[in-house]
UniProtKB/Swiss-Prot annotation:
Family classification: Belongs to the complex I subunit 6 family.
Entry EC number(s): 7.1.1.2
Listed Pfam families: Oxidored_q3
Protein localization: Mitochondrion membrane
Membrane topology according to the record: Multi-pass membrane protein
Catalytic reaction equation(s): a ubiquinone + NADH + 5 H(+)(in) = a ubiquinol + NAD(+) + 4 H(+)(out)
Alphabetical list of PANTHER family matching this protein: NADH UBIQUINONE OXIDOREDUCTASE SUBUNIT ND6 (PTHR11435), NADH-UBIQUINONE OXIDOREDUCTASE CHAIN 6 (PTHR11435:SF1)
Annotated source species: Formosania lacustris (Oriental stream loach)
Protein name as annotated: NADH-ubiquinone oxidoreductase chain 6
Gene name of the encoded protein: MT-ND6
One Gene Ontology cellular component annotation held by this UniProt entry: mitochondrial membrane
Amino acid sequence: MTYLVSLLLMALIVGLIAVASNPAPYFAALGLVVAAGVGCGVLVSHGGSFLSLVLFLIYLGGMLVVFAYSAALAAEPFPEAWGDRSVVGYVMIYLLGVGLMVGVFWEGWYEGSWVVIDGLKEFSVLRGDTSGVAEMYSYGGGMLVICAWVLLLTLFVVLELTRGLSRGTIRAV
């Protein structure tokens, strides 16, 4: 299990570097899907299966559709690919930054312990992620509404940023 979590965390770093280093929206979308899937896998490995499923469905159902629509409207004739010099340079810079941070924090890495949600299940009556969902819907209803409005505002901001010179993205087809 430790090897699987380590592999998932390394794949998460690779996916995030793929998003940050590539200026072309097509390849960055692939990095986003990899990072979202692997991040949900990390959550599953720590016991949050329901939360990871909800996050993955929200991501694929909403944000990726908006991103694909906006990327199609802001199409480049010759996007930069994975093997271009500038992209490889950015990848090397980000890998160097990750390596430096690993070197700085390597000493205290194994001193602390992460306990998964049901790591001490003999002392608990409830499952961690399902009781968290109940708390979110009972006490976090206002925050859920605020988050929905922020996502709607983000949609309009992205559509406004990707509009052309004379015609916007919200137009009659």
